Amino acid sequence: MKKLILSSVLILSLILSGCANTQPESSSLISIDDDYRTAYQVFVYSFCDSNGDGIGDLKGLESKLDYIGDKGLGFDRIWTLPVFPSPSYHKYDVADYTDIDPEYGTLEDFDSLVSKCSERGIDLILDLPVNHTSSEHPWFVSARDYLKSLAPGAEPSSDENLYYDYYNFSREPQDGYTNIEGTSWYYESRFVSSMPDLNLSSDRVKNELEEILEFWLKRGVSGFRLDACTSFYTGDRTKSIEFLTWLNAKAKEIDPSCYLVGEVWADQASYALYYESGIDSVFDFQFSGAEGNIARVVNGTVPASLYATAMESEEKLYASYNENYINAPFYTNHDMARSAGYYAWDDGTKTKIAGALNLLMGGCSYTYYGEELGMKGSGKDENKRAPMYWSDDPEYIGLCGGPKEMDRFEMKFPSLENQQNDPLSVFNYYKQAVRIRRAYPQIARGWTVAEA
C-alpha cells in the first residue's frame, strides 16, 4: 500500500482545531477495512459490571459498545486484556486457552460480543499470553505431578508424560527457575512462580498454540496482542524473533487477515528489530509513558518539533525491517502510571493535548480505557487498573469495585456523567480527536514529513 504524506503542519492544525467546540458527526467518520484503526484498550475486570458482583464482564462491555464506537467516542477496534480462565484478577496466568473466565461470562457471551462489535464496525483483538501459563493449567499440573512421581534418579520422558515436554525443567537451580516442592526439579518461571514458562521449541506446544489461534479466529476474533515477546527466549532475541516469525506465519495461514501486535518492552532500536518477523505491529514505547516523547513535548522539556522529527525518523526505521509495518503508538497502558499524573498543576490542557498527540500518530493508535476522562492511577499495578469512572454515584449500574488490592484515591477530573455535557471537558476533547483521526484517513496511513 502506498502511504500518503502527512506534514507536521497538518498535524498541528488538527490539534488546534480540536480545541474548538466542533467535531465530525458519525456520518463523516470514514471506515476502511484495514488495520490502520483507532483502538480502545479494555481491562474487562474494571470496565463495566452487568450482574452486580462488582467485577466487570463481557455483557458489561457489550452494553458499552455504543459508548466506545461510532455513536460515542468513535473507536473502531477493541483490545481486551486476557479473558481466559485464570486464578488471578489480571488473568495473564492462563489456566485454559479455549474458554472464558467465569467471572467474565461464557463463550456464548463472547460470541454475542463479537457479533455486536461486528454490527458496529468494531473489530476485537484478544490479549494472548503464550510465553507462560498458570501453574494451575492442566498441562503444568500433569507434568509437575509426573516429576513428583519419579523414583530418585529416574530420567523423565515425554513418552511417559507428553506434558513434560511443554515446559522447561532442570535438575539444577538456575536464575528464573522455581523448585518443585519435594523434588530436586526446577522449572523456568521468569515472571513469578505461578507462571511457568512454556517450552516454545516444543512441536507439541506449537501444535497447541496453532489450535488456540484457530479456535479464536474461527469465533470471529480479528487478531491478537502478544504479551512479553522479549521473554519467549529470555536473553536470546534472535530465537524470540524466529518464534514470532513462526507464530505470525501460522496465524496468517489460518486467517490471512489476522492482525498481530507485539509487546516488546525494550529500547526503540531493539523493538524495531521484531518487525523482521513479519508481524503487523509492535507497540511504540518511544512515545509512551512519563518519560516518552509525548509527555516530554507537552511538559516542554524537549522542543515541540521533536514530535514530528521523531515520527519521521522512526517511520523510516520500522520500514527498513518491514515495509508493510503498521505502527502501534500508545500513550499509557495497564502496566504504566496513568497520564493525569504526568503533569503538575494541569487544568486539563496538557492532558488533552497529550491525548491528541497520541491519536494523531500514524498506524493503529491505542488508548487505554479511562484516559479519555483523565483518570488517575499510579504505584502498584492494581492502581493502574482502577474501575472505569462512569459516575460518582456508588449505586450507578455497571460500576465496578476494582482489584481488591488497589488503593482508594480521588480522581483528578470528574466522572463521565459530569464531563459528557461539558464541551470543554477532557472527554469531549478526546472525542473530537478520535473523530478527527477517523475523518481524515491519511492521519493513520500517511508518512510524516517534518516541516520547519
Regions flagged by a language model, labelled:
Residues L4-N21:
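Sec-dependent N-terminal signal peptides of Gram-positive bacterial secreted proteins and lipoproteins
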Residues C19-E210, K218, R225, C229-S277:
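Acidic/aromatic-lined carbohydrate-recognition and catalytic surfaces
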Residues V114-C117, Y318-S320, L357-M361, A452:
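A short acidic-Thr-Gly-centered motif at the start of a beta-strand
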Residues A266, F330-N333, A344-A452:
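Loop/helix patches that line or flank the sugar-binding groove of alpha-linked glycan CAZymes
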Residues D49-S50, A95-D99, Y331, D335-Y343:
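Short, basic, glycine/proline-bearing loop/turn elements
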Residues S50-L65, Y343-G348, G398-K404:
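Short, polar loop/linker segments at the starts of domains and inter-domain junctions
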Residues A249-G341, L360, E382, P387-R408:
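Glycan-recognition surfaces
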Residues E62-G69, V114, E210-L217, N248, ...:
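Non-transmembrane alpha-helical segments in soluble domains
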